[in-house]
Amino acid sequence: MSSPSMFDRISSPRQRLSNPLRSPPIREVSEYDLDELEPRSDDVLFDQEPPLPRLKKNMQHVSATSTRRSSSPASWDSKHRYSNSPPHTRSKPIFAGPPPPIASSMMMNQHPSRQSTVSSHGDNGRGYGLISASRFGSNSPSQKHVDNRPRLDSIWRSLQRREKALERDIQQLLDLQASGLIAGSGEGSESNFGSDTTTGESTFYSTATSKSRMMNSLHMPTRSTPDGNVIPVRQPVSNKPRGLKSTRVGLQRSMAALSDLKAEEDLHLSTALEQRKDALAYLDKMSKRRDDIYSELHALEDDEEEPLGQELRSLEAERQELDHDIQRLEEKLAGAKKRRRWVREKMEDVKGRREAGLSGYRAAGRDVDIEVRTLMQTPPIAPLDIDALGYGENTRPKENMDILRGTEFLQLRPERRTVEMARTWWQGEIAALERRKAQISQDRQALIEGSEVWSDVTGLVAQFEAKLRELVKSSQAGDADEEPQQAAMQSQLSEMDDVVQELQKRLQLAESKHWNLLICAIGAELEAFVEAKALLSDTLGLPEPAAAVDSPELSDSTDKAEGTSQEERADSHDESDNEVPADLLVSRMEDHDHDPPDSPQQQSVVLRRGSAGNNEVPVEFLADLHGPNKIEQDTEIAAVTRLMSK
């Protein structure tokens, strides 16, 4: 079940306080056969009367606990599903609710006192609001045990698991991309690895396999019960290999999913920061209020210029003077005694008024002390899991090692917790969350910039492949002369040099910003272009330029990409859980919004992938129109086109 929301936690303090006071009634031990169970009557959820027991025979002693447990969602579903069918045609449902808890009933009968304790702990485990009565009010007198165990927020580990899953998907897509590019640059030019269309052989194999599965047995298994309950059937896993086009699209989608995950984590971080800042502000407000009250109280007690204090001192002096006058003047004894009686009454009145004024401050100070003590016993914020935010034991900043963590604060006895400890705890968590938020913003910016770079790379590749494909079509049609075609192919070589230079610039940009994901992807595209260029140069019989082949930047970037891929492959092989290494996605790229279906980039990609294997004219049809040299040249040009399409 999901944790209660902020509004649910704020709006239900009475219900949360009243639940621990109510313990379920003790159920007598009863044992019966499970075959005698049947669904509840149709009006369990809507009648005001208590539900009947689930046994066919009359049972006199049925506890409220078993009655509540029998009202499971499965029983509600079966009740509504079979409510319209006649009772004589209703068959026994597949699942009519859980059986009565025999073993747990015996344990609860042996330990009746533990039920209330467990229920109170379970109620305390729910979410707390910042202004709930259980946090800042007085606790219930019947709640004797306080659960001091730290409860961590599980959303951070959930986000971490989702991020690791996306990283594994990205690693698989990178492996598929490398496999597709290697297969496209291999000797077998007619290999269709990674193509989006299936061959006749694979179709026949899948058809034969499906027929063998269907005809394995003459007995057809039951798909559903007579009442309409569908029996689930395990579906086979699709073994169809993904093509290079789908791999690139998958990389784009994975980057978009990773960007959405970062946005969600940023939202949770903002919420956590706001909660802790509110708690810290409330704590500062209470501390300031208490300090103001006590400072004013001490100032009033020690103020010699206070009117009531001065009046009290003057009356005391007058009383002493009157006592002396009584001793000296016996004739004035009657008047002096009367005056003394009046002065004493006046003193008592002044003392009472003064104490009444100071008692209000003392009561307010005691209330604040009680509220702060309650806040220290049950803090409104769950401890922050520093490890789930990406800080391991070795990568944790030095300042995080010195701060007081929430788990350490909650492990202390409540009477030993102080306001300074709570302030140190929340200030440290706020600093950690702010650092994580800054890192998330930096990662999102890197993802946006990297996605733009990848879009430029795919656009360059698609534009060049479209031009090369048009040239191959014109050469295979046989309408143009050989010399203009030779010049066009040489111009394609120069354009290929430009594309290689642009890819090298993008690769250098990715290396300068340590974008390992783009280094792998762009390096693979660059290597494919270099191989295609070499093949095209050999076809035309032109010497390959030394700058393009022996470029140190290209060799360094290619070696670096290959070394990174080999290290990542070795690390992923050594790890038992097949996780993506942490340094592969140091700067994770966030994909921009998906292009519309009619955008130039998607059209170029679709054109490059969709027309790669369908618009090629077989060499045999050109044997009558061209000589042997022309056929050989067209064959090699078609091989270059297929290599670029891979």
Curated annotation (Swiss-Prot):
Regions annotated as coiled coil: 283-350, 485-514
Keywords annotated in UniProt: Autophagy, Coiled coil, Cytoplasm, Cytoplasmic vesicle, Membrane, Vacuole
GO BP terms, alphabetized: autophagy
Composition skew (Basic and acidic residues), residue ranges: 557-575, 588-597
Disruption phenotype: Does not significantly decrease the growth rate under nutrient-rich conditions.
Location of the region described as Disordered in the Swiss-Prot/TrEMBL record: 1-148, 221-245, 475-494, 546-612
Primary localization class, coarse: cytoplasm
A cellular component annotation (GO) from this entry: cytoplasmic vesicle membrane
Source species, domain of life: Eukaryota
Bias (Low complexity) ranges: 63-75
Subcellular location: Cytoplasm; Vacuole membrane; Cytoplasmic vesicle membrane
Polar residues: compositionally biased ranges: 12-21, 106-122
Membrane topology type: Peripheral membrane protein
Family statement: Belongs to the ATG28 family.
Its biological purpose: Required for the autophagic degradation of peroxisomes called pexophagy, but not essential for general autophagy. Involved in resistance to elevated pH.
Protein name per Swiss-Prot or TrEMBL: Autophagy-related protein 28
